[in-house]
Amino acid sequence: MAPLKHLEKENPIIDACFQDFCASHGILTIEDFLLHDLYELTAFSQRQTNADRLKEGITLILSLIERQCRPLVNGLKLLEDLHRNKHTLSTGDKETDSLLQGGFREGQLTELVGPSSSGKTQFCMQAAASVAENHLGRVLYLDTGNSFSARRIAQFICSSSDATLGQKVMSRILCHTVYDIYTLFDTLQDLEITLRLQMNVNESRLRLLVVDSISSLITPILGGSGSQGRALMVAIGYLLKKLAHEHSIAILVTNHTVGAGGEGGKTKPALGETWKSIPHVRLSLSRDHKNSNCTISILKHTSLPSGQAAKTLTRKENQQCP
């Protein structure tokens, strides 16, 4: 759950004074607030010199919690939202776009699964360059393993021969390094607040969010028999899907593979069965190391049959744009 301090930027009434009052009662997060006796908390607030301000803060938090209880929406409204706000974004590869009938869908969480050196990061950078160049939107790239390369991104941009235009496209891509699950939580919660405050129009709108890789952050917290790690994993998944839907963002995350057990050396996506149900779309990327050809296939999709596949081609460093 979000710490109270994350609410201050959008709600000034939840200032340091209010946070200190809550902290004195062991309340640091929204979850703590829900678990506390609110009648007792209100009674304590009335004994303070700034009782009116504290009571206003308590009322505000309750209203914020109530707003998070999403209302029921009928199918017609969902369809209208799909046609009006949820567009497709090119992945940067024609064959993949054809396979996905246009590319990534805004409002959806897409997972790209593949073994090490299969080309997942290259695919992500190519997608980032494509969205920044062709869709005139911003891209936020969360890098968990120092694999992001601005030089490689620039090579994907076909307009790079025009230095001014190339720089403008590059300026639409913002990269943050994220090394643990808690930093990812903070980053996504700050992003949620920022998106709510700003007017998302034209080039200022965030259209693609990349997390490369989500599994490197989640795997370390899944050890042992406790359920806390899985709860954090589900919470991250929920937050990503919430951002995607409410702000019409296409979200792309990468996941590695693990042994499936048994003979034959088969593999399966990491993070287990709990995570399996979270992404809207699940794609598998494999590479033939003899000729460097890549194959992308659909493991799961909301509107397309699984099992379909296509050969992909990511441009080599010395290859010119068509």
Swiss-Prot record:
Pfam families: Rad51
Residues binding ATP, per UniProt: 114-121
SUPFAM superfamilies the UniProt entry points to: P-loop containing nucleoside triphosphate hydrolases (SSF52540)
Cited Gene3D superfamilies: P-loop containing nucleotide triphosphate hydrolases
GO BP term, example: positive regulation of defense response to bacterium
Keywords, comma-separated and alphabetical: ATP-binding, DNA damage, DNA recombination, DNA repair, DNA-binding, Nucleotide-binding, Nucleus
One Gene Ontology MF term: ATP-dependent DNA damage sensor activity
One GO cellular component, as annotated: nucleus
Localization per record: Nucleus
Signal peptide range: none
Keyword hit for Lipid biosynthesis: no
UniProt similarity note: Belongs to the RecA family. RAD51 subfamily.
Functional note: Involved in the homologous recombination repair (HRR) pathway of double-stranded DNA breaks arising during DNA replication or induced by DNA-damaging agents.
Name this polypeptide is given: DNA repair protein RAD51 homolog 4
Organism: Arabidopsis thaliana (Mouse-ear cress)
Lineage: Eukaryota, Viridiplantae, Streptophyta, Embryophyta, Tracheophyta
